[in-house]
């Protein structure tokens, strides 16, 4: 009984919920004013404004007392001298070589469903939740994009951009803001700290067609119409919102364009715009904001949200130096950027076009000059005419060279063929006018066509006309005058609208045989339709925008039959039109807020009503009727939006009295024209389904009894006909009665709501059945289909050797993948993502309600068929205690080689260690930090000190070995209880085990490490630690997919390279993707795998144990087949680095070039030491200094040049900013002048560096074994604003390394520095004259000696290459590289305490004894 009642309660609950949701969604006003409501109030509140002001965030706007001219009162920075936006004068911008290609990472990826849009009241912002990185283009580093903002104008494509080019502004400007993620965790933090940020400006220019890339943005705009509204965006590609070519851009330094106006922005302004249609532009003009003026707030349209342009004030605007980027003529972009009438065409169309027969084979085409010329003069006219013969479409075009000759004779015409004529004016620079009206001519029949539809009636009139008169008509309508037999037809949608692009369109492509057949030209004549029923329209340019929403009332007075101004206006009856217009205009201003609020709710109702209206017209096609209103898609109904790109001022709905009922009166015997701004109805199959707008309700005469059957039995015929016997046949179609509308609309609405509720009911029942019922009745039984996982999953087999790539061809393979903008990588990764799409791989246990809390991320699940099953615990929850979010993953030639799992949660520590113990795991690979970017990524599942108990396992931390990029922690585990809780007797060492954790600390989430070499070392060492008796290696990051999968693929491929000398990344990854979802999560990680494997193949394993170093050195000195030694090959790899690692943009800036002693020895962007920038001074964040990886820390050392006189304070600022406490000064061969040599203060006078002072407090000397001395200075750096003090020790060293001293003495200085560094924090600053070989050698030997002490092994190649990667140009000669091997051989020999028959002379040469092999001596290194 209980189970039967539960669905009933759910149905009752659903009914109440659906009612509440309906009220909330359909009537958002009901929820306004409540905190956290589904639809927040778009009005804001005085409480919110007071709270904003109280928090110190001043209110500002774009107009009134809070407008841009008043920003400076609340934000002083807005009055600065380097403000934005500016006008860019192209010919004054100079090309700078440092501004090369812009590098975009992640911009080609589709956005996630976390990306959302918000109406801030000042703009519409897109908050980017994915990783988008920007570098190059002279930017000082790699920046991360965080948000996108838009600025637009008033309406109709008017100027709205903040920046301009040569004084030309654009309708919309999109701005993408980015910051340096290495220093800050958000853009706002960087602004608060007044640190350098960047912005890209993209202009939107009006085009004829919709830009499909903007569709998700436009849909998002419709969801944030009101202030403070937010919505998630459909996936979009950010790169598609940028210009197709990114090579041409401008660069300048400016400010934020909104308060606080911080002057910290590096602007990138793209020259080329992005297209956007008028229809898409309307979405921007429909955005609302809440404005505050004094103590009154009001809801207004958000328009003109741009800041006035600021003075340049001696700033320089630069242009990119990308090859061929500026070769194109700028006139195509800058001539007419706004997309208004004046910019789309050079003039209005030619007018008064006529076609007259001269004789049986010739026609005369005449026209008048355009009424308005936007870009004079007119050079000539282009006449186009087309026809169809034998189902072949043909077209001819010729030009009248004279702008005064306004006629043309067309010869060799046939009286039996339909011709289409149109004329276009041609101005300078190939600019053209819109096309004139299109004339359709056959014998004595002429038709005028203009607009995007051809509309035809379906019956003859009572009195056919006998003349061939022609009269212009409104857009989308047509006039026929002729005599002949009756025929029937329907309207057909065409693409023959006026051209705005200035280019000639093809008419013949439109006038197909179907169209001509529909026109009735099959040898018979055409019956006429009274031309008086067709309205005319004012020229587009002459129709004011504000009149678009005003009503016009038809009258009983007939209109003039001839074209002219008298006919171009609508008449009113006894002043009613004006009165009603004023009333409606007032109502619109008062109720505009309400109308726009209900706009979305009415949209479905309007569509249904329009369809019902069209159906009723079709059913009553033979009924007598009066003139009806045109389709209504006006500003009043659509919020000033247009449909299908139509002008908003062309379709105005006549309105009289009540909005529910509108009537038109006419004389019984005189047909009446519609108002000048109306369009006759035109329905086709396409229009009926997609574009039929809502029509106003009108009254009509009741149906005759003999025609009532049409209402009861509607026909499927979609023709719109008129009863020829009725004298009142002055309209094309009829309207259903008000009685019909009273039940049609409620029926549609109720049906729709019922359908929605039914769908919701089904969804809720399914969800209840799946979750709630399962939670209560879940039984661990083989007969339950809900809990039996699908373990027969079609696994992608490991590809055979035919698909593997030989190592020798791998370099070529990678170069092919990198070609064409990394297109090969993109294709491969798409294939990886698709490989499991069609497989029915389940994750039932992860989705079970009792297990969901054990998942760190809701979308990272453990596949059922490969999941790791724990031994169930006894107790009431035992049936679900076997679950952990972990999967077995295959390795190279070994099943279940790894366990890929998530970073353990606190609640799953016990499960994690139960898995470790049950699987006999000896190695844990951790590739995440506990907290990254302020977010918890993993919980600490090992003890910090002493021991921790996790379930029945006691874990003890034995030691912590810290390296530059990873940490090793041996963990001792002991099982002290069995599952039943009783004490277990120890059996030898079975209950104890050592588990080693390898923790990589320099791998960012969803990203890749900066360098591949340290990763290879980490993978090799963790893999080598595994012994045959161990179980699977447990690998985890945060989610256990991206970084975890990358590690597994690299490790497996290294084993395959070693075993078979082949690589198959794609095949292997597709195979393991069937075992755990999302392994290798991003394309960037997929590329990194290849980079790491390439590094491994080229460099091979270069780590050598101390006892094998001597033989290894001899082996690399033996020449190979080509005559080169391995030592030479190694050094070539040391000096040849990937270009992306050695980018040096900051050092090449004009403002920084003079700060470099040698332009060939400068810091790479990835390792550059940054300074806190000084406000208002460009380039103050730069110093010629590089971080150098040491043995214990990735930023253990800093190599820099000897300070120049004008960079001395920068040098001390670096010491202060980075808390450096040791300075090692190495003199070079060239002696410096005294004033340049000494960069520190004397005892008598301190050095003032603004934020701090430098004071020398002591000076001492330290004697070395060779009687040389080290001069030691002790300094104190004291803050001027607080009590902070930094103690710095300065070592002024003698000549090092000394060529006249034994090599063993080289390490004497190193030992002094190492001993001092043990007691001090911060990096060690090492400098010689250029920051090159002497400093690099000291850092290299320090790291190698520490490696030898701790690991009894050395890797000279990796240390030297890492130094050259982080500071290009340090090691440039092979002798410098050889010296590192010499020094380490000397150190190994010293440690072995005379082991081996070697002695060293003063020059470092080996004196071999008689019994030694000369080839094994160090002499071979010379």
Swiss-Prot record:
One of its GO terms (cellular component) is membrane. Residues 825-1096, 1127-1387 form the Tyrosine-protein phosphatase domain. It catalyses: O-phospho-L-tyrosyl-[protein] + H2O = L-tyrosyl-[protein] + phosphate. It is a single-pass type I membrane protein. One of its GO terms (molecular function) is protein tyrosine phosphatase activity. Glycans are attached at residues 109, 113, 156, 359, 444, 620, 632, 640, 728. InterPro entries: Alpha_CARP_receptor-type, CA_dom, CA_dom_sf, FN3_dom, FN3_sf, Ig-like_fold, Prot-tyrosine_phosphatase-like, Protein-Tyr_Phosphatase. Keywords: Disulfide bond, Glycoprotein, Hydrolase, Membrane, Protein phosphatase, Repeat, Signal, Transmembrane, Transmembrane helix. The chain crosses the membrane at residues 743-768. Its main location: membrane. Residues 565-576, 688-708 have a biased composition (Basic and acidic residues). It comes from Gallus gallus. Residues 541-708, 1396-1422 are annotated as: Disordered. Disulfide bonds join 78-261. Residues 1-19 form the signal peptide. This is Receptor-type tyrosine-protein phosphatase gamma. GO terms for biological process: neuron projection development; signal transduction. Residues 349-448 form the Fibronectin type-III domain.
